[in-house]
Amino acid sequence: MEKIFKILANLKFAIALLLLISITITFGSIIEQDQTLDYYKQNYPLTNPIGGFLTWKVINMFQLNHIYKNFWFISLLLSLGISLIACTFFQQFPGIKFSRRCYFSNNPRKTDFQTQLKTNLSRNIIYTIISEGYFVFQQKKNFYGTKGIIGRIAPVFVHLSIILILLGSIFASLGGFNSQELIGKGEIFHIQNVTSSGPLTKLSQQAIRVNDFWINYYPNNKIKQFYSNLSIINGDGQEVRSKTISVNKPLIYKDLTFYQTDWNLLGLRISHNNKNFQIPVIQTTQNLNKVWLTWLPLESNTSKNLSGETIIINNYKGTIYIYDNNGQLNKKIELSNFIENKNYKLIEFLSVTGIQIKSDPGILFIYFGFGFLMVSTILSYLSFSQVWLGIDYLEQNNIKLTVNAKTNRTKVLALTVRIQPFL
């Protein structure tokens, strides 16, 4: 078992895993994820495969249509995590343990700086070493100093950070979900239209109410921003949280995040003879802008002289344009105004707001992992330096001082500059 862990702790093995994961993520970025089989058959046909090999059968066989949730990708992440753990225990911890020891030696090997001198200023040299931040230990006539032990400990936290990121990714793949909802103003809804989910996903039964929806426009009638006011409702029907969301300003409640994504018109509410009714609209586009069309009957369907008017809506400002049967603009009507002979009154635009709901149980692991990774990576670049001093007493009160120094980051020690005047 120990041999297996030593293989897992091998740097080449970890690099190979990272390469495989990188290639897999590249495929996940190129191939659209979580689409229907018909979509892949249409875009990745058997004839003329992309790159000479990529067809819908290959995608389906290797589960490339949901890479981040399939078993072999999660196995790669787990293998990398185990490799990092093995490397930490078999390589990092022994190195830290060795660095904490007082390693006294008269002639250490592979040093970056070495000199011998006859001097009576050994005490001054030792004080200089201490002033440089070294911890100095003495054993008879030998001195040993270390500095920057945090630089040897930091790689352990780098590994821990990456493991946290891997765990967060696995939790997100197994337990996260994504939902798209189109909800009318004033309605209460639950999460239903799930577009993607993991095998261990548990859908929240949280109730949400859309209190209001509105749009801000630029002077040229281009949409500036659209907003939805949402309320979180508890089991007793009480509001526990409320926030107005917009694009890039979501509502976060527990493990749910609500994003503003889209909007649409469903119809118009009209009043006729003190009775309200609704007429649906049909969406189309004009110059890449949304336009809605509908037809308002002005007589009953049983009338022989059935007539009506065409209504066009091109924004959410509360304005409609009425055209006659010849396609000529008849009038422009605002909300709460009468459409025809004070018999038909425009009451309300019936709109829906598009809400994307995400749950990611691994997001905190990923955030903390990246935070630790940034800090520990910076700390890992701190040099771990060692210095050895050996004192030999000569005749006539002279002292022979042997100085050796070593560092793991740079070949030029700042300490050598400080002790240069004594050499």
Curated annotation (Swiss-Prot):
InterPro entries: Cyt_c_bgen_Ccs1/CcsB/ResB (IPR023494), ResB-like_domain (IPR007816)
Keywords per UniProt: Chloroplast, Cytochrome c-type biogenesis, Membrane, Plastid, Thylakoid, Transmembrane, Transmembrane helix
GO CC annotations, alphabetized: chloroplast thylakoid membrane
GO BP annotation list: cytochrome complex assembly
Bilayer-spanning residue ranges: 11-31, 70-90, 153-173
UniProt keyword Calcium, yes or no: no
Signal peptide: none
Function: Required during biogenesis of c-type cytochromes (cytochrome c6 and cytochrome f) at the step of heme attachment.
Quaternary structure and partners: May interact with CcsA.
Family indicated by similarity: Belongs to the Ccs1/CcsB family.
Name of the featured protein: Cytochrome c biogenesis protein Ccs1
Organism: Heterosigma akashiwo (strain NIES-293 / 8280G21-1)
Lineage, highest ranks first: Eukaryota, Sar, Stramenopiles, Ochrophyta, Raphidophyceae
Name of the gene encoding the protein in the UniProt record: ccs1
